[in-house]
A protein has these predicted regions:
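A short, Lys/Arg-rich alpha-helix, primarily the initiator
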Residues: 1-27
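Residue at a beta-strand N-cap/secondary-structure junction
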Residues: 17, 28, 44, 59-62
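Short basic helix-loop element that most often maps to the first helix and adjoining turn
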Residues: 18-40, 67
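Conserved hydrophobic/aromatic packing and binding residues within compact polymer-binding modules
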Residues: 20, 34-35, 50-53, 79
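Acidic-residue sensor for enzyme active/binding pockets
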Residues: 31, 54, 64
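Recognition helix of helix-turn-helix/homeodomain-like DNA-binding domains
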Residues: 39-60, 82
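DNA major-groove recognition helix of helix-turn-helix/homeodomain DNA-binding modules
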Residues: 57, 61-78
Length: 83
C-alpha cells in the first residue's frame, strides 16, 4: 500500500477490509466519497462503520460486498483474496 502504512493491526471480523482500503486509496477516493457512492447503491454505512470495516473489525454483508466491488470497480473475488 505504499506510503500509507496502517497504524493499527487488522482485526479478524472480515477478510476484505485491507483490499477495500487498497482499492480506495489507489483510486484517490476518500472514505466520505466512498460512503456517498455506496449510498447511491442503496447501502448506507456510517464513517465509523467504514473505518471498522477497513480495519477488519466489522463484519461485512453480502450486499455491502457487492456494492463495494461495484463502486471500487474491482472483482468480488479480488476483494475476497481469491484472485
Amino acid at each position: 500500500m505504499g506510503m500509507n502504512k496502517r497504524k493499527l493491526a487488522l482485526g479478524d471480523r472480515n477478510i476484505i477490509g485491507a483490499r477495500v482500503t487498497e482499492a480506495r486509496t489507489a483510486q484517490g477516493i476518500l472514505q466520505k466519497d466512498l460512503l456517498a457512492r455506496l449510498q447511491v447503491k442503496g447501502v448506507d454505512i456510517s464513517l465509523p462503520a467504514l473505518s471498522l470495516l477497513e480495519g477488519q473489525k466489522r463484519p461485512v454483508s453480502d450486499i455491502e460486498l457487492k456494492a463495494l466491488a461495484e463502486v471500487l470497480q474491482v472483482d468480488v473475488r479480488w476483494l475476497l483474496g481469491m484472485i
